[in-house]
Amino acid sequence: MRVSHPGFRIPTVAAACLLGAALVAIIPSSTQTAIANGDTRVINLHHAHTQESISVAFRVNGSYDAAALKKLNWFLRDWRNDATTKMDPRLFDVIWEAQRGVGSSAPVRVQSAYRSPATNSMLRRRSRGVAEFSQHMQGRAMDIHVSDVSMARIRETAMRLQRGGVGYYPDSNFVHLDVGSVRAWPRMSYDQLARLFPNGKTVHLPTNGQPLAHRQPSAPAPPCRACA
């Protein structure tokens, strides 16, 4: 382990929820895969506000490392008041997998991680975009940026994981990732989402609210319709 110290909720209808539950049940768990494979996973983070950096193996031989998680809990504290919480370790798996999926090797820049209730209330007074019961308050979310790939690619890769929430903020150049319910904002168009999930098996909903798995069969199309 290496540490340096230089100084909305999206509503869904009941039918969509049932569909989501069914699809989640058939999506392989990368956590289980990591345990089965005996993975060792290292996460490299840099905090935008404290200017601290950390490189730590949060998984060793497939299991979470308690000492590493404790260090990450402090690193990802509410930087405004140093309040800490127990971060959900599944979040580190999501970030590790998303970064690996896009081929990024740069440290993950953390814009926001844990938020104490006091901080969340303060931010809600400033912006309507801050959820009252934010996943940040539960230690289940991070807002991140990586310098060597576009945030659009991080967004797409994280959405494919279907492991929680994905919020895309291109104007602020970061992506929100959490391990709450599977959802994404802003929603993609039907065509955009279909390119990510050509088989239609996704919990995500497009802007028209119509689940891809419910779309009508179409006539056979030429192979490889720019679906990369």
Predicted regions and their residues:
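Boundary at the C-terminal end of the N-terminal hydrophobic targeting segment
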Residues: 29-38
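Active-site acidic/histidine clusters and adjacent loop/turn architecture
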Residues: 60-111
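Loop/turn elements at helix/coil->beta-strand transitions in domains of secreted/extracellular proteins
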Residues: 52, 104-108, 162-165, 173
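Bacterial N-terminal signal peptides
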Residues: 14-26
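Extended, low-complexity, intrinsically disordered C-terminal regulatory tails
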Residues: 97-125, 227-228
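Catalytic cores and adjacent binding grooves of peptidoglycan-active enzymes
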Residues: 41-46, 130-228
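Short, surface-exposed glycine/acidic/tryptophan-bearing loops
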Residues: 59, 63, 114-141
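Bacterial N-terminal signal peptides that target proteins for export
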Residues: 3-17
